[in-house]
Amino acid sequence: NDNIRSMGVALTPCIIPEVGKPGFSIPDGKIEIGMGIHGEPGIMLSDRMPADELVDMLMGKLLNDMPLADGDRVSVMINGLGATSLEELYIVYRAVQKQLSGIGVSIVMPHVGEYSTSMEMAGMSISIFKLDEELEGLLADEAITPFYTNVNK
């Protein structure tokens, strides 16, 4: 979709249930930027960094690919990959919210939690969903599925 951009980061590999061990490795002190939840290779390895710096890097890539302007409305999803605490995810959300509000972008219906995970993988993804009136209405509609529920009407 032209209105959604996502990028994730992995701090540790996922465990493959059938074999009981990681299917890949990430060197100590490194993170993999852009890694997929199934272990698909990312775009680069980087040294570990504070959350605010990591968010700056990820948001820079997202906003470079999908520029936003003063007055835009977005929904944000901070998705934990399976072994990242909710507290850590909210630290990421705080940094995303600060950055977006700084350019005049409003966040509607933020989602922070584990929505799509991998076994024991530490990391998270940031998804930005640019809304128009129709999309915002659809996002607010009731939804009950195994992986996503919205009954906040």
What name fits each language-model region?
Residues 61-153:
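C-terminal non-catalytic interaction/assembly regions of soluble proteins
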